[in-house]
Amino acid sequence: MKVSYHGHSVVKIETNGKVMLIDPFLTGNPKTDLKAEDVKVDAILLSHGHGDHVGDTVELAKKNNAVVVAPFELATFLSWQGVKTHPMHIGGSHEFDFGKVKFTQAFHGSSYIDEENKTITYTGMPAGILFTAEEKTLYHAGDTALFSDMKLIGELNNVDVAFLPIGDNFTMGPEDAVLAAKWVQAKTVVPMHYNTFPVIEQDPYQFVEKLQNCTGKVLEAGESITL
């Protein structure tokens, strides 16, 4: 399984001849190396409904006839826009032809904000994502605070790589993320959701230096690891 980081919270997974994108915020993302018009994808996995995570989902899904796997309310909202969806919820899992997806808790918000009409649409509970294929497991925490049940994620799953937000302000910061890494018990930890905007500026190298009992890896946009 090949896993690539593409800035902010964008993660690409290639396995079993399929390509998946998690939280494809491409257009307007100053930290990504991808352009929506160049992306080919079989499935899109969404952690929650905020614009910097849903991003180019509708365009990519329609262009590629890709299924969007998302929390129930968000999946319903996107289905009304003509997107093929598979709704799930916290604690549920499903075996797809590209791998197994399970949604975990995340402590954050989830909504679609229409700036033009000044409306906010509730899009359900935010989630973390566990993805398993080729006997390897990836944990994408989504946007989240530190929470004690991360210990359960570590106890119940053999996590090979965890993508954890470190930006602070909207999510946990580096200090809390160090503890999250300990609780999740991932073999490799990759920081995400930082330096996209001034309010979430962090030094990812200082973060990985503080990690214990795991390998910290800072990935630049376009860099990958193989599990």
Curated annotation (Swiss-Prot):
The keyword Hydrolase is assigned to this record: yes
Pfam families for the chain: Lactamase_B_2
Disulfide bonds, paired cysteine numbers: none
Record key words, sorted: Hydrolase
GO MF term set: hydrolase activity
Protein family (similarity comment): Belongs to the UPF0173 family.
Stated name of the protein: UPF0173 metal-dependent hydrolase BCQ_4418
